[in-house]
Structure formats: C-alpha cells, structure tokens
Amino acid sequence: MNTPDQSQLGRVSGYADQYDASLLFPLPRQPKRHEIGVTGTPPFFGADLWTAFELSWLNLRGKPQVALAHITVPCETPNIIESKSFKLYLNSFNNTRFADAAQVQTRIRTDISEAAWRGSDRQATVGVKLVLPEMFDREPVQELDGLLLDRLDVECTHYTPAPELLHANHGEAPVTETLTSHLLKSNCLVTGQPDWGSVRIEYSGAQIDQSGLLRYLVSFRNHNEFHEQCVERIFMDLWTRCRPIKLSVYARYTRRGGLDINPLRTSHPQALPANVRTARQ
C-alpha cells in the first residue's frame, strides 16, 4: 500500500518527456476515511473533478499539440491519484507522438482508471474529456451559487478542524439552503504548502447555524490534508453533527502545477455538476 511520504511530493523530481504511465502514484482512500469514522460503505456519493491545464503532445509529424483535460474520478474508487505524480505523468506526453487527440484521451482514461482502481476486484473507467484550442472560448468562468457566509462578521479563534462549532436548530421547521464561502484554506498533507478553495454546501433539514459553519470552515486553515480528504471530513462532520436529511459538499480549489481538484460529496446520488472553473482558478 502506497503512503503519502513515499510520493514525489516535496522532493526534487526529474521530468520525463516520453510517455510513462508508471509515474502515476495512487494513494488509498481508506486510511483517512477511517479517521473520520467511515469504516464500511461510505455514506456519500460523488467524484473528484480534475482540470489539467498543461497537456501537450506531438502529432505524427512532430508538431506540438495542446489541450485542456477534464477528468472525473468517482469517489468509490479505492485510490486517489497523488497530484504531483499526475503532473509528472502528463508531462511525460510532451515529446511523445500520438496519431490524434482521441488516442491521447484513450491513453489517459486507461491509465487513470487502472491507477484509481488498483488493488480492487472491481474495475471501471474514469471520465476524460479533452478540450481542443478551437473550443477554448467555450470554457466559462462561473462562481459557486448560494448565500455567501463570508458576509458574517465573526470572530475566529480555531485554525484546526473544530466540529464542535457546528450546530443545527432541530426545534424549528426544516429548511433547504445553499451556502458558500471563499475562505476555505488547508495545507498539503506532505509539504504543508497552502491550498486555497471555495466551498458550496447545500442541505435540507434542521437549519445550520451560519456563524458556526463559517468559523468551522475557517478552522481548516492550518490543517494538513489533501483536497479530497478535507471535503469528506467536512461532509462527515456536518452529517453527524447537524443530521441533515440531504447534504452536498462541493469544493473548488485553486490550481497547482497546472492541475485543479474539485471534490463533490453528496448524501444521495445526483448528476455531477459541470466542471466549470471559478475566477480564482
């Protein structure tokens, strides 16, 4: 089983420019899920939506080609893909010749699927969509919808996760709300480098105290964990402490190394959102 300290994070790495799928470094989801009380089938659905902004290869005549890539990794895969290894893997396409973009897309889908499902009896594919330059002007920028929590003038004193700040009013009629914040910040599990994100929380049930929720989100500020793990922690803290009927937690993190990761976790199956970047991305 791979562990984060075995990855290339925080190390000086050489950059292969010839295709090499072995650069991908999957990490099991379960150890971090165990920390938040998820020991069997997770009580959530969803996916990790990746955007790759630095993808290039050569055509059969040696001419460079470029594209964006949208990659969708279901959260039921046993592994996440460590992001630096993903970057190194994509860089290995740089001087490799492919017949066309479809061949590149198929290659990425095959490799990411194998890494994400490695070690599992179940095998499935991840979603991969390439956006070619003639379609770049159709890539929108859109902010997360919902009532902005950041408008609240709260005093913040907790900078490591403090789920005790979460409260819901179970004595009143249930509500349906969508709340957002741009103040989510955590740190890379291995390097401690800052990760900046915006988060959207949609729920139905007892009304969640908004001031406490904002202070709780701020409490991730000095916490070291990968993006996917932070979102699952937020989901589980809200699910167990506020006991909503329905819950969705969706975060969009700023890019690093030409990649952004945008995890979604929901209590009920639902269609995935379009992978649309925000202004900060």
Curated annotation (Swiss-Prot):
Give binding positions for substrate: 81-83, 227-228
Judged by the first EC level, this protein's enzyme class is oxidoreductase
Q: List this protein's GO terms for biological process.
A: queuosine biosynthetic process; tRNA modification
- The positions annotated for binding NADPH are 83-84, 256-257
- The protein's predominant localisation is cytoplasm
Enzyme active site: 188, 195
Q: Which Gene3D superfamilies match?
A: 3.30.1130.10
Query: Hey, which pathway is this one from?
Result: tRNA modification; tRNA-queuosine biosynthesis
What name does UniProt use for this protein? Answer: NADPH-dependent 7-cyano-7-deazaguanine reductase
Q: Which organism is it from?
A: Paracidovorax citrulli (strain AAC00-1)
